[in-house]
C-alpha cells in the first residue's frame, strides 16, 4: 500500500504540474508519462530566461539541445517545490503564478498502462509494516550470516571493505547527500575539492602515479585494476597477454 501511495502521489504531482503549465501557455509533449514531463516553450519565452529564473530560485532543470525542458518528479517533491516550479514558468511568461494548495489523486495514465495484477505478494513484503518490525527481521537475517566480526571469510573485494560509523555519518547529511549527478559543475566545487584532496593524499601514501575514485563497487574496482594492468602491459609491448590467474 505504501509503495502504491508513493507512486500515485508522484504521478499526481506531475499531472498537476502539467495542468498548471498548460494554463500558463506551455506545451507538454509526453502523451503518457509517470513522473517526467517534456516542456515546449512558446515563442515569447527563451530557455535562457527559464534557466536564469530557475537558478535564482536554486532550481536545476534539464535543458535539451532542441530547446525543450525536462522535469522529473520524485517522492521528495512537495507542495512548496511544485509551486516554485510553477512560479518559475509563470515569471518567464509574464503571468501570475497558479497556486496549488493540495495534491489530489489525479491519474493521466490510460487503463492499458495501469497494472491490474498483484505485486510484492511474498510474506516478507506483507508481514513487516513498522520500522521496528523491519529492523528485527533484518537482525534475524544478520545473525544467520557469517562476517568478519565472527571469523575469517573468503576473499571478497566488497566484503573486505569496512566503513566506520564516523565515515558514514556525513553521508546522511544534506550537504553531502542531496546532490544530483547531473548538477552543473559550478555547483559541485566542494565535491571536486574533496575528490582532488583525497586523490592527492592517496597518491602520496601509495606512491602511485594516479588514483581514481570512480569505481563504486568491488567489481568495478577489480575491473578498473585489470584495465590498469592491461594498459601497463601494452605500454611495455606485452599487450598479447590475455590470461588471468585468479586465486580460489
Predicted segments, located by residue:
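Conserved PLP-anchoring active-site segment centered on the Schiff-base-forming lysine
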Residues: 232-248
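Gly-rich Lys/Arg/Thr-decorated short loops/hinges at beta-loop-alpha junctions or inter-strand turns
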Residues: 1-2, 29-33, 114-115, 172-186, ...
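Conserved N-terminal alpha-helix of the aminotransferase class I/II PLP-enzyme fold
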Residues: 130, 176-216, 221
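Short Gly/Ser/Thr- and Asp/Glu-enriched loop/turn motifs at secondary-structure junctions
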Residues: 29-36, 63-70, 216
